[in-house]
Every structure is written in C-alpha cells, then in structure tokens.
C-alpha cells in the first residue's frame, strides 16, 4: 500500500483485532520496517457485532443498538490507542500539504472541494442555483457525503425525494441523481409506483439531466428480477433487464475514462463497484480499469446530459464531472423557464 501512497497520506497504523500484548510485540517491528508510528490497537470485542446481508452492508436504521455499539467502540479505542498523537499527526500532515499547495495558514477540517476556486464559482452562480432532485429512501441510500457537498459547492441545490413513497419527482427539479442502494429488495414497491416510474422516464425523455449509479442505474432499466426470481417493470429508460448472477460480478476500485468526452474533460474519475446484480446492457461509453492489475471492461451509458452505470463515482477525484452536471442542470433550468 505504501508503494502506491504517493501523497504520503498514510501517517500511522492502528492494529485491528489484536490484543494489547501482541500490539506491544509488533510495534517496534512495524515502526522499524515501515517507518510508520503504531498508534495503538483495537482488541477483539465480542459485544460488538454488525449484521450483514449479501453485500456485507446493512443500513444504520436497520440495526438496533447501533449508537450504543459505536460508543462502546469509541471508549475502547480511547483506552488502547493514542488519539492525541493521532490528531497531532493529522495536523502536521495538513500543515505540510498546505504549504506544498501554496497556502500559508493551517486549513481547518473543511468541506471537501470547497477550495478558493470552487468558492469563487459558487459566488458567481448563487443567483441561479439549479435544483438537483436526489433519490433517498430504503431503496436508494448509498451516497458519498463528499459528492453531495461538492454538488452544492458548484452551485447545485439538493432536494430529496422518494421513488418508493412519492407519486412524482419534485416539480422544481432541474436534474436527477439516483444513487445506489437495494432496489432489488424493493422491486415490487418500485414497480407498483407507476406514476413515479413514468415521471422519471418522461423527465429524462424531455431533456432533464440525470446521473444514475448502481441501484439507480438498475431502476432505469425496463425490468428488474428480484431475489425470488420475479420480473418487475422499472422506469424503462434503458432497454434490458437487471438480474442476480449469484456471485460478485465486479468488485473493487476502478479508474473510469470516457471513450468520447462529455463529463470528465479528458481525465479519469475514481470509482468503486461491488454488486451481485448485473445488466444485459451495461453500456459502452466508458472504460473501467483496475488500478493494479489493469483488468478493464466497458461500461456506462452517457451523452452530454446523462450518465448511467454501475460504478459509484468519487466526484472529488475529477470535479469536472460535477461542474458539467451542474451546468447541464442550469441549462435545462433556463430552457424550461424560457418556454
């Protein structure tokens, strides 16, 4: 890992699931061989257990006593790790990189993407903030907080809506963001909400910009096969069906590049895939490449206004993606108001 850490972002080590005695034994070895400080350990705690499902993930609202477990973990970490030293190292790293980047003041822990250039963009665009409707419910709930903050930093106004519980997308929407989640567990409810399916399809057909990742991408298909093997009609924007392959289809980090430039300004964007479901129409607008092994495959449906595919993108790795999407929403806003 250290060989790929070109920005020296790894500044210390905490040994997980080890006893304090083993930690004391390994600390001098690790510090000598790796040149990194060992900041402590986190012993095995039988009382701490997080349930999982087929993707290894359950939502916080599904787990009873989660806050209690988090507090227990925090108390144990305070006992077995040097948190004061960790904070000192983090501040030193931030100061070093602030000077490297030409800043003279120690940066506060700020919202990702809100550097000087982005703030200037936001100030210029405050008078015309396009509304981005973000799907958020039991079916669509996977979002990087950094991504949402960056959308706001570039001038987007986020509003939430539920494809499960509402009849149509928000009237003020200028763009759609359909994130990942577990639509396969809610396939029947999503399918039976015909008015929402029609609302999304008609909005996209009428030119509304949209981004759909993983679960959101699945929802845009003609149909989805649920865990019991039953097919359910979906939004019908993308031809084809999504179905469970019974194994991990693609897993891990990738760099995604476009075949023809639309969203990414000629640069890659970092992404992550982790899914058992697959599509018989994954798209061919982009190429995803594993950073170490170099394994690659085609993916993504895109044009100037739409980006649909399985990869979960990390927007700060290529802010051009956000800039393009927000600008597309702004143009749609103007077009709609001009009618």
Please identify what each model-predicted range represents:
Residues 158, 183-260:
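Cysteine-nucleophile active-site neighborhood
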Residues 117, 130-194, 198-203:
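Phosphate-binding active sites in nucleotide-utilizing proteins
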Residues 176, 213, 235, 274, ...:
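Hydrophobic, well-ordered secondary-structure elements that form the walls
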Residues 82, 127-128, 140-152, 157-158, ...:
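C-terminal and late-domain segments of enzyme folds
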Residues 17, 136-138, 241, 313-314:
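Residue-level signal for short, function-critical loop segments
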Residues 9, 33-36, 154, 231-233, ...:
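Short, structured coil segments at secondary-structure junctions
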């Amino acid at each position: 890992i250290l060989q790929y850490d070109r920005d020296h972002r790894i500044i210390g080590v905490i040994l997980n699931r080890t006893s304090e005695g083993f930690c004391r034994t390994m600390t001098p070895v690790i510090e000598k061989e790796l040149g990194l400080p060992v900041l402590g350990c986190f012993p095995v705690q039988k009382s701490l257990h997080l349930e999982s499902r087929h993707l290894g993930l359950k939502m916080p609202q599904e787990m009873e006593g989660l806050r209690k477990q988090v507090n227990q973990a925090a108390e144990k970490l305070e006992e077995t790790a040097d948190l004061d030293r960790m904070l000192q190292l983090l501040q030193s790293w931030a100061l070093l990189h602030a000077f490297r980047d030409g800043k003279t003041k120690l940066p506060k822990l700020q919202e990702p993407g809100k550097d000087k250039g982005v703030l200037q963009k936001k100030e210029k665009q405050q008078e015309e903030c396009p509304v981005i409707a973000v799907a958020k419910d039991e079916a669509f709930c996977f979002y990087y907080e950094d991504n949402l903050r960056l959308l706001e930093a570039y001038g987007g106004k986020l509003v939430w809506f539920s494809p499960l519980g509402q009849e149509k997308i928000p009237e003020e929407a200028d763009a759609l963001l359909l994130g990942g989640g577990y639509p396969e567990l809610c396939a029947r409810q999503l399918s039976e909400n015909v008015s929402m399916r029609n609302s999304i399809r008609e909005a996209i057909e009428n030119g509304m910009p949209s981004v759909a990742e993983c679960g959101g991408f699945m929802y845009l298909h003609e149909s989805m096969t649920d865990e019991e093997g039953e097919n359910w009609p979906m939004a019908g924007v993308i031809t084809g069906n999504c179905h469970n392959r019974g194994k991990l289809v693609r897993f891990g980090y990738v760099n995604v590049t476009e075949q023809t430039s639309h969203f990414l300004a000629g640069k890659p964007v970092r992404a992550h895939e982790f899914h058992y479901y697959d599509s018989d129409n994954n798209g061919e607008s982009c190429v995803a490449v594993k950073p170490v092994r170099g394994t690659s495959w085609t993916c993504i449906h895109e044009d100037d206004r739409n980006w649909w595919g399985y990869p979960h993108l990390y927007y700060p790795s290529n802010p051009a993606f956000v800039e393009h999407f927000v600008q597309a929403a702004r143009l749609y806003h103007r077009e709609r108001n001009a009618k």
